[in-house]
């Protein structure tokens, strides 16, 4: 995923190439297109057509090509399993333990619950997280927190996610972190979200609470930065 995010961050630079030599530009485009076609035929899993993914996401075809190259570089087979996903994700958080949060994040990406994440799964989630509406991002976050996928978030699920995030950030990010800080954080947020006090947070309660409380929204945006 490191290569994927790296290539994505450089998209704007690549898109601003000077167009002084049209013939050279056309040659480069045709060469890249041939390379893309060859790449598509050499992997074990061939993703959906880029036109279809372009229609389903907020990325252009060219951006999808760049993202695909990065994904294939990290995952030559065209899919990534949980163990590989954890190894890649751990590289971004060397001072903490990212394994538990990576497990939850992997399950959120693996929408079909097959035990592997395809390029389509990855780019669809990335599209929501980077360019989705506030509503789309909140729905995706709710699904992440709903660990057992029963349509609700209970306090222990929220606690598991928040603690995993604190563990991942490590001691250098939180030098004076007390052991009960995650629990206190969850207690405050859950009390605000569980509006009818039935011990669970529904999607509607989650959406309403997040959009009406700036503190919750800021915290979620902070947590989304580690996705």
Curated annotation (Swiss-Prot):
Residues 38-94, 97-132, 133-168, 181-216 form the EF-hand domain. Detected in hippocampus and in the molecular layer of the dentate gyrus (at protein level). Isoform 1 and isoform 2 are predominantly expressed at equal levels in brain. Colocalizes with KCND3 in inhibitory interneurons in cortex and hippocampus and in striatal interneurons. Ca(2+) 2 binds at residues 194, 196, 198, 205. It holds the Pfam family EF-hand_8. InterPro entries: EF-hand-dom_pair, EF_Hand_1_Ca_BS, EF_hand_dom, Recoverin. Gene3D superfamilies: EF-hand. CDD domains: EFh (cd00051). It is found in: Cell membrane; Cytoplasm; Cell projection, Dendrite. It is a peripheral membrane protein. GO terms for cellular component: cytoplasm; cytoplasmic side of plasma membrane; dendrite; Kv4.3-KChIP1 channel complex; neuronal cell body; potassium channel complex; voltage-gated potassium channel complex. Disulfide bonds: none annotated. GO terms for biological process: positive regulation of action potential; regulation of potassium ion transmembrane transport; regulation of signal transduction. Ca(2+) 1 binds at residues 146, 148, 150, 152, 157. Residues 214-227 are annotated as: Interaction with KCND2. Keywords: Calcium, Cell membrane, Cell projection, Cytoplasm, Ion channel, Ion transport, Membrane, Metal-binding, Potassium, Potassium channel, Potassium transport, Repeat, Transport, Voltage-gated channel. One of its GO terms (molecular function) is calcium ion binding. Belongs to the recoverin family. Component of heteromultimeric potassium channels. Identified in potassium channel complexes containing KCND1, KCND2, KCND3, KCNIP1, KCNIP2, KCNIP3, KCNIP4, DPP6 and DPP10. Part of a heterooctamer composed of the tetrameric channel and four KCNIP1 chains. Probably part of a complex consisting of KCNIP1, KCNIP2 isoform 3 and KCND2. Self-associates to form homodimers and homotetramers. Interacts with KCNIP2 isoform 3 in a calcium-dependent manner. Regulatory subunit of Kv4/D (Shal)-type voltage-gated rapidly inactivating A-type potassium channels. Regulates channel density, inactivation kinetics and rate of recovery from inactivation in a calcium-dependent and isoform-specific manner. Modulates KCND2/Kv4.2 currents. In vitro, modulates KCND1/Kv4.1 currents. Increases the presence of KCND2 at the cell surface. This is A-type potassium channel modulatory protein KCNIP1. It comes from Rattus norvegicus.
């Amino acid at each position: 995923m490191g290569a994927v995010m790296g290539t994505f961050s450089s998209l704007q630079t690549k898109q601003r190439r000077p167009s002084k030599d049209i013939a050279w530009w056309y040659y480069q485009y045709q060469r890249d297109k041939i390379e893309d076609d060859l790449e598509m035929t050499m992997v074990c899993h061939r993703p959906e057509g880029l036109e279809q993914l372009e229609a389903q996401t907020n990325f252009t075809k060219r951006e999808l090509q760049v993202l695909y190259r990065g994904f294939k570089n990290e995952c030559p087979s065209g899919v990534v399993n949980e163990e590989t996903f954890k190894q890649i994700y751990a590289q971004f958080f060397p001072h903490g333990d990212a394994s538990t949060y990576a497990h939850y994040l992997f399950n959120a990406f693996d929408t079909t619950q097959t035990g592997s994440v395809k390029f389509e799964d990855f780019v669809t989630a990335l599209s929501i997280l980077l360019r989705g509406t506030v509503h789309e991002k909140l729905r995706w976050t709710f699904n992440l927190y709903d660990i057992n996928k029963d349509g609700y978030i209970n306090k222990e699920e929220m606690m598991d996610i928040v603690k995993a995030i604190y563990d991942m950030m490590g001691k250098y990010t939180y030098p004076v972190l007390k052991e009960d800080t995650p629990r206190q954080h969850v207690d405050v947020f859950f009390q605000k979200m569980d509006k009818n006090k039935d011990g669970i947070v529904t999607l509607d309660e989650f959406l309403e609470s997040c959009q009406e409380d700036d503190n919750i929204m800021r915290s979620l945006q902070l947590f989304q930065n580690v996705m």
